[in-house]
């Protein structure tokens, strides 16, 4: 199987990665990818980007070398209603997102979280 895009990556901006956008784009191009989604952590994650970062994504070029860049976020689903930790004023600048369940699911435990998904309710 040949992959054409990496849809989940972090740069220095997320606080725990080690590469710049330019370095990551060069590595993606060297691997033969066509696109790279930069999905920095949303503000709820300690030590990561603030809202200001997401509100300024429109100034980042959408191409670096031969790689198409997709600006995005790794958001956290905060509760059963599907509320996420990136307000619309930041999320509206994102072209791509990935999501994870926040600590409410961890507190309830694995069984309850799975059962909740079976009932079409996000926990």
Give the ranges of each region predicted by the language model:
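Hydrophobic "anchor" residues on beta-strands that sit immediately upstream
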Residues: 2-4, 35-36, 70
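Histidine-centered catalytic micro-motifs
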Residues: 4-15, 38-41
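Divalent metal-coordination and catalytic microenvironments
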Residues: 8, 28, 40, 69, ...
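Glycine-rich anion/phosphate-binding loops
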Residues: 16-20, 111-112
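Aromatic/hydrophobic pocket-lining residues that form π-stacking "cages" and hydrophobic walls in ligand
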Residues: 24, 39, 57
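Non-catalytic positions within long, well-ordered alpha-helices that form the structural scaffold/packing
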Residues: 25, 29-32, 119
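Short acidic/polar active-site loop segments enriched in Thr and Asp
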Residues: 34-35, 39, 95
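Extended substrate/RNA-proximal surfaces in nucleic-acid metabolism proteins
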Residues: 48-123
